[in-house]
Amino acid sequence: MKYDFSTLSPDDFENLSRDLVGAETGVRFEAFTVGADDGMDGRHAKADGSIILQAKHYLRSGFSKLKSKMREERVSIDELAPQRYILTTSVPLTPANKATLTEIIGPSLVGPGDIFGADDLNGLLRSYPEIVKAHEGLWAHSTPVLEEVVTNAVRKAMAPAEVPKTLARLMPPPGAADAPIEPVKRDTIFIIKASPIDDEFTLWLAPKLEAEGYQVFADVLTLMPGERWRREITSALRHRAVKVLLLCRDSSLEDSSIQDDLDIALETGKELGDQRFVIPLRMETFRKIKGLGDTVAVDFVRNWGEGLLKLIDTLQRQKVQRSIDTMINPNWEIYRRRGAVPIIEVPERLTSNWLRVAEAPDFIRYFECSGSINKGRLQGAIDSYGHPCALVGGSGFLAFGGVPEIEMAFEAVGRFKLKHEIPLVEFTEGGFQRLRIDRQIASNLVVAMLKKAWFNYCKRNGFIEHGYSNGIGFHASPEQAPTGKRIPWGNQAEKKRSSMLRNSAKGHIWQFGVTAMPAFWPFWHFKLKSRVLFAQDNDTPAGLVVDDPKKLHRLRRSVCKGWRNKQWYGRLLAFLELLSGESAFVRLPLSETETFVIEASPMLFSSPVSTVLPNDLDDEDEELDDSTLGRPDSDEEGGE
């Protein structure tokens, strides 16, 4: 198509000239704002001189006006003294016209070839079609060009999307529909799942199977799970699946797309003669699945790790081939990160549940009986002693007490002598070979003694002991923390705050408590684990204790669901306030003369980065909701 440039303003023509001549000569021209230009519409500076470009949009004035204007410009051109001068014009030029202009412009013009008339510019537009698209003033009023632009846009929008490479390599090769398909190696485990409920588990399971040498496919690998590539995924399953893992829960098995995929998998298994082609994975309890018969599902309800081991064992027993060359597909991680919280380079202060150890005894002592001794009587004497001890060997024990204290406490059992005084840190880090105690046993013995000291301290201060499956916790008694009472915590500098350790909700009384676990790495500290107990509200301060573990679990999931992190942290600080009283430390007696001192305030850590999530929950440090549950709409939640 030939353009006459009549639709362009003078500024538009200058811009077009810079782009065309710049593309043709391979140089970039500077652009200048509207106004006096000293004979320049574009300039390219070089060490040995400048290249000057001037554009003259004289279409309607014709060659005569252009010639007169160039005579006026001659003085400016000579003053600029460019190494090279280039002229563009919208006026059509003959060879004679160019010769006339060459004489007028003078020595700055290298030759007639540096004069671009309308025909020359049209030639450049044909050579650089992308410049045509960039200058819509050329074609905005041209029906043929507009039709071409719209047609190309529609064709591009309607073009079928390219199948993701991860999926494309599993599909049958293209060919005639009735052409026989060459048999290929079945080497891919397909996962049938519901989105998005099963995405997290799939992103956890698939890389671990690939690490074992299995090739795995699920729709999240396309980075667009769901219906987008359904037909292609079905084709790939028929073509390459060696096994199919079905994630089972009633809610997902009712999905029509899951049922369709399962039907295809069962049909494929029948064609292959593999009755165990589909391996169900139990994510929740589910009803019997038609077509799977009595197939036993691999259980992932209790523990994902145990389920993975059973699944790998199942695949090995069914002789599913593995490859040492299998690489973990990076798309698993790419999809997992799509919902990740962005990190920013701003430090953030973090709270913790660690209490730093401030003081500890220098030595632990080993006492041994000088004669024969009854172990039962020795254990009874240790229990009566009231401070931590640990039996070692047949006739001795470890303790922190001094010689006079031990002799007096154990005189009814036998005569004990101090055999070894061992540096405490050396003992926990290296054991004590003279007593045949290795490092791990030594560490365990000291941990047990420190736990005993914590238990004794909590009991003496009126806290209620409760045994959990993985430890002993202590809760404030109804006298220490009555139902609905706020326990103040914090110092005056950060304003005094308060939290509840006991309150009523959903017809039950909940009570907050703590389990303490001593640890030596990376430094000595106590780690606190929050606990919540429930009692049926029978109008008594303590209530009727709920002992059923399943009911306790349901109550924790429902009642504590509305508690935010700051509420949990506030309860922990309120508990420590009761535990330490007016002191900044908790002093655990290890003997009549030795104490183990831990700080009563949890440690603060600093992270070099933080997230962009908002943190506007400061008002919840002071519990405005009387139920402290963050669920004020519940009819059964009591207040003060």
From Swiss-Prot:
Compositionally skewed regions (Acidic residues) per UniProt: 616-626
Native source species: Sinorhizobium fredii (strain NBRC 101917 / NGR234)
Pfam family name, one: TIR_2
Tree of life domain: Bacteria
Protein name: Uncharacterized protein y4cD
Classification via SUPFAM superfamilies: Toll/Interleukin receptor TIR domain
rRNA processing as UniProt keyword: no
Keywords: Plasmid
Keyword Transferase: no
Record-annotated TIR domain positions: 184-328
Source species taxonomy: Bacteria, Pseudomonadati, Pseudomonadota, Alphaproteobacteria, Hyphomicrobiales
InterPro entries for this protein: TIR_dom, Toll_tir_struct_dom_sf
Region (Disordered): 613-640
One GO biological process term: signal transduction
